Amino acid sequence: MLPAEERPAVTHPRATSGDTVAEPNWDERLTISVGSRDAEIVGTNDRALQAAVDYVARLGGGTVRVLPGVYRLRNAVYLASSVRILGSGADSILMKEPSLKTKLAADSDWFDQEITLADAKGFAVGDGVCLRTKNPHNGGMEVAKRTLVARSGNRFKLDRALRQNFWEMGDSTCASLFPIFSGENIADVVIENITLDGNKDNNENLDGNYAGCVFLQDCNRITMRQVEARNYNGDGLSWQICHDVLVENCFSHDNTGLGMHPGSGSQRPVIRNNRSERNDIGIFFCWGVKFGLAEKNKIDGCRSSGVSIGHRDNNNLVCDNDILNSGKVGVLFRPERGKAFAPHRNRIENNRIVDSGPADGVAIDVQGETDAIVLSRNQIRESRQPMQRVGIRLGAQAGQVEMKENKIDGVSVAVADLRKS
């Protein structure tokens, strides 16, 4: 048997049952349009959009064209494999409706598929909801995202069982919170040329481990291109345990959480030519993000750090970015609980890092037992007064850090090496 590298190349493939690798390049694929008029599915809410996604997915994939208009969502649009969402840029706006919140009026056990609300006013069948409770054993927060599918008065059936106990003693609540686009266990999806608005002034917070303008979990080969993700009370774009995600030419701004959140376990993300502005953190590498690339992005005015790298985020390249006006730190290597948990073998190269933090701000801060880091050809500049500002700070526990050809201007201390000699 020939080794894989000598296998003959695939030419002129045919559509073959079960073959998800080699597919003919068809001249035309199924396309369904959604809009307020002159569309195959007429409507401007989540139900119309979901109907289009489900129709296209049932036939093996294709494109959902979102025509110009404002689409008001009472539930997430759940994506499906091999479906492309194609909007009309700034003219196609998916807007989250204001959130409601109430306590649960009766206990629900982990095997139950229903809840009882203390005040059901404003809640309706079809709504997406987020249930939260304190675990009675350890006090931790439990979260479940569900859809209301039937009701009798204040009692609502859920689309799935709870799988956690939601008891009154845990201060259990129900809120109409959800991502705008949601995807779990799907692959080969494109979201393109569309505007997503989280309506943060009228919604409570739901963090990026559960939601965002886009929230993805356990997915493969996802592309987000020319997506504007704004005003979410949480993250802009968040993907957890998702591999080979491409985010390019997107604009994530004015979210209360993270602009772009390559989440835990995500392998090989490519984040290119985007803008992340006025978020809490511009690009946040979560836990165990490896072999990623963040290049040619503009990260401006983020309240905490421009780029944050931490728990076992190894072998990533952050290069040719403009990281401007960060609230605390330009690029942060987070302190973790030991060397085995720290981020290693990452490269920060050829970035322009300008005006980082307050009077004691730091452009590049290497904390914890981070090791085998390369800081190369970065331009670090401070246009305000030097104050106590630092260009590059190496923490006391930092390991090997290679620094070469960095240009540092306008700070009080160019390099603060706190390691023991």
Regions picked out by a protein language model, each given a short descriptive name:
Residues 1-193, 197-203, 413, 420-421:
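Extracellular "leader-to-stem" segments immediately downstream of a signal peptide or signal-anchor
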Residues 127-165, 185-277:
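Right-handed parallel beta-helix
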